[in-house]
Amino acid sequence: MGRFEDDAEVEDREVSPALTVGEGDIDASLRPRSLGEFIGQPRVREQLQLVLEGAKKRGGTPDHILLSGPPGLGKTSLAMIIAAELGSSLRVTSGPALERAGDLAAMLSNLVEHDVLFIDEIHRIARPAEEMLYLAMEDFRVDVVVGKGPGATSIPLEVAPFTLVGATTRSGALTGPLRDRFGFTAHMDFYEPVELERVLARSAGILGIELGAEAGAEIARRSRGTPRIANRLLRRVRDFAEVRADGIITRDIAKSALEVYDVDELGLDRLDRAVLSALTRSFNGGPVGVSTLAVAVGEEATTVEEVCEPFLVRAGMIARTPRGRVATPLAWTHLGLQPPVTGIGQAGLFD
């Protein structure tokens, strides 16, 4: 089985929930501009609406907001919507960009009252900047240290009242003190296919694509519950329809296009199937350690564990057990193989 040698190939998978190279502008054009336009996440939308409306009636700033969940579900879009709903300016940065306390102090000093500060990947913020953020979130001030050693002095600086919106794909990686300073936390879940159909219909309208209802359902079914993936697959299918058909996307056109791009009926791509194939054919379904499995497909263990495994576990094709990874009966049947008699759930597997 061939190695996926180029890291960019792994990162630019059609079913990757992360933004790929050159995708930012197109992704931005499809973003909803208000809570009313935002599709899916009904509980989060309702809760956010109450938080924002309450703040507007009081004439103050809402509590700091933490948005958590897998990539590609709309956390950045919601941050933009929060600023728009409040009629406030949005300042954007990311956790990795805040390496020093001075980086954060410079950004905070430029805020004006009621601004929204969005920190993406907030779990990756450096500790000195995080500790400065505590005081800014609680008391709207920061202490800037001038000088070094015994002669260093701390100068307090006032910060205009602002709302921090943090986004994270790993809420468990946040420190307790930082997490506790968010007054409202929303967890975003994967989308149902019917919700993705609505996302696709909206995007098709914006992009001027003729998309049949059955075609939308076909694309939605393969989009791994993620709007960003759905929109990417829509653009790939559009290219196929324009080059090899009359530009109209029917169900058959969608199926043919996604076969070309190696996205099967459950949303698995070539790398996913390579992992399942190694697990079933080379290791008889497991259990097997992730490092051994990674060697079998010629990949890094972190790639298998962080890129492939989350979806395969959620799709019910791989189970994590104390003894290692195990292929479920669904994995065997998806590959057209007969599950062994001693499959998952049999006595002794989890001993």
From Swiss-Prot:
Residue stretches of biased makeup (Acidic residues): 1-12
Span list, region Small ATPAse domain (RuvB-S): 192-262
Matching Gene3D superfamilies: 1.10.8.60, P-loop containing nucleotide triphosphate hydrolases (3.40.50.300), Winged helix-like DNA-binding domain superfamily/Winged helix DNA-binding domain (1.10.10.10)
Any single Pfam family the record assigns to this protein: RuvB_N
One Gene Ontology molecular-function label: ATP binding
Subcellular location: Cytoplasm
Enzyme Commission identifier(s): 3.6.4.-
Assigned keywords, A-Z: ATP-binding, Cytoplasm, DNA damage, DNA recombination, DNA repair, DNA-binding, Hydrolase, Nucleotide-binding
Catalytic activity of the protein: ATP + H2O = ADP + phosphate + H(+)
The keyword DNA repair is annotated on this UniProt entry: yes
Binding site for ATP: 30-31, 72, 75-77, 138-140, 181, 191, 228
Major subcellular location class: cytoplasm
Large ATPase domain (RuvB-L): annotated span: 1-191
Region (Disordered): 1-23
Residues the record lists as binding DNA: 320, 325
Highest taxon of source: Bacteria
A Gene Ontology cellular-component term: Holliday junction resolvase complex
Broadest EC class assigned to this enzyme: hydrolase
SMART domains the UniProt entry points to: AAA
Residue numbers binding Mg(2+): 76
Function: The RuvA-RuvB-RuvC complex processes Holliday junction (HJ) DNA during genetic recombination and DNA repair, while the RuvA-RuvB complex plays an important role in the rescue of blocked DNA replication forks via replication fork reversal (RFR). RuvA specifically binds to HJ cruciform DNA, conferring on it an open structure. The RuvB hexamer acts as an ATP-dependent pump, pulling dsDNA into and through the RuvAB complex. RuvB forms 2 homohexamers on either side of HJ DNA bound by 1 or 2 RuvA tetramers; 4 subunits per hexamer contact DNA at a time.
Subunit structure: Homohexamer. Forms an RuvA(8)-RuvB(12)-Holliday junction (HJ) complex. HJ DNA is sandwiched between 2 RuvA tetramers; dsDNA enters through RuvA and exits via RuvB. An RuvB hexamer assembles on each DNA strand where it exits the tetramer. Each RuvB hexamer is contacted by two RuvA subunits (via domain III) on 2 adjacent RuvB subunits; this complex drives branch migration. In the full resolvosome a probable DNA-RuvA(4)-RuvB(12)-RuvC(2) complex forms which resolves the HJ.
Family: Belongs to the RuvB family.
Domain-related comment: Has 3 domains, the large (RuvB-L) and small ATPase (RuvB-S) domains and the C-terminal head (RuvB-H) domain. The head domain binds DNA, while the ATPase domains jointly bind ATP, ADP or are empty depending on the state of the subunit in the translocation cycle. During a single DNA translocation step the structure of each domain remains the same, but their relative positions change.
Protein name: Holliday junction branch migration complex subunit RuvB
Organism name: Mycolicibacterium smegmatis (strain ATCC 700084 / mc(2)155) (Mycobacterium smegmatis)
